[in-house]
Amino acid sequence: VSICTGINDVWRQFDVPGIPSEACTPDEYEHNLREMIERTRDKVLRLFLATPYFMEPCRADRMRARMDEYSDIVRRLSSEYGCELVDFQAAYDRFFEHKHSAIIAWDRVHPNQIGATLMAREFLSHCGFDYGHMPVEK
């Protein structure tokens, strides 16, 4: 089972700041994520926790900084509960060392095909998927 949550929780703090009831605070986020982990972990073979992400390379950007807070919660809980951490933000940050974020998401939240492929590759790398042993079509 994989859990990736928090992106809209952060986004709502910036796209509808006048409606605070729409926002999920870091404390609420941690409580909710902890509850999901505790209700799931003993029922599955492996539990993957994925960091929320914001496709913005500038860590000083207010929304990126807030997303990093939520990602830190995921990292901490992943370690605490022994879950497999899939760090989507780190994967995107590696991409941003070479390309602009607009290449993978016009709004910095919803990935296009390239962005989704980066996510898939990052997730599969934590599942033991070996790209060197792909079946060859005959």
Residue map of PLM features:
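Alpha-helical cap/lid subdomain in secreted, periplasmic
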Residues: V1-E137
